[in-house]
C-alpha cells in the first residue's frame, strides 16, 4: 500500500509539468475521518460548498491495488462556478476546485494545485482577483486542517 502510494505520487510529479511550488500540500496529524470533517468545515468557513466527494480508492482497488482511504473533494462558491463557466467556458476543466485527501501511516495528506497559477493561462483582468482569492482561501483552509489536532 505504501509502495503504491509512493509510485502514484512519483508518477504525478514526474509525468506532469508540476513543480513543487505549483502544488499546495499539507499533512494533518488527524486520522482520515477527522481530517475529512475538518476539511469540509474549513471549506464551509471560507464560504464555499462541498459539491462532491469522489472515492478514488474504489477505482484503484478494482484494478487490484490495495490502498488506504483516498478521496477528491470538489467545492465552489454557490453561483460563482456556474457564472465563471458561462463566461469563460475554457475554464470548465478546472471547476469546481478540488483537493485530494488520503491517509498515510496515521497521518492524512491534502494536496492540490495552486489556483493562482491559473493566471498564467487565463490572463483576463477580471479573473486575476478570483484566482488570487481562491489561493488565499485555500491557504486558510489548509491552515485550519494542519492546525486542528
PLM features: what roles do these ranges have?
Residues 20-51, 143-147:
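Terminal, regulation- and interaction-focused segments at domain boundaries
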Residues 115-149:
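C-terminal partner/receptor-binding element of secreted or periplasmic proteins
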Residues 44, 48, 53-97, 101:
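Compact, glycine-rich, soluble single-domain proteins
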Residues 35, 39, 52, 56, ...:
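Stable alpha-helical elements in mature extracytoplasmic
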Residues 1-6:
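Positively charged n-region of N-terminal signal peptides that target proteins for export
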Residues 7-16:
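Bacterial N-terminal signal peptides
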Residues 98-123:
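Beta-strand/loop substructures that line and gate deep hydrophobic ligand-binding cavities in soluble
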Amino acid at each position: 500500500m505504501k509502495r503504491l502510494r509512493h509510485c502514484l505520487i512519483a508518477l504525478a510529479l514526474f509525468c506532469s509539468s508540476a513543480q513543487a511550488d505549483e502544488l499546495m500540500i499539507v499533512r494533518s496529524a488527524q486520522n482520515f475521518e477527522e481530517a475529512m470533517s475538518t476539511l469540509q468545515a474549513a471549506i464551509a468557513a471560507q464560504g464555499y460548498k462541498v459539491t462532491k466527494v469522489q472515492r478514488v480508492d474504489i477505482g484503484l482497488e478494482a484494478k487490484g491495488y490495495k490502498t488506504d482511504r483516498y478521496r477528491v473533494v470538489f467545492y465552489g462558491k454557490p453561483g460563482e462556478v456556474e457564472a465563471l463557466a458561462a463566461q469563460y467556458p475554457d475554464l470548465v476543466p478546472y471547476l469546481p476546485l478540488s483537493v485530494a485527501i488520503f491517509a498515510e501511516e496515521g497521518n492524512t495528506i491534502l494536496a492540490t494545485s495552486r489556483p493562482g497559477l491559473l493566471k498564467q493561462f487565463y490572463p483576463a483582468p477580471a479573473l486575476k482577483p478570483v484566482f488570487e482569492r481562491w489561493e488565499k482561501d485555500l491557504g486558510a483552509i489548509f491552515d485550519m486542517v494542519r492546525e486542528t489536532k
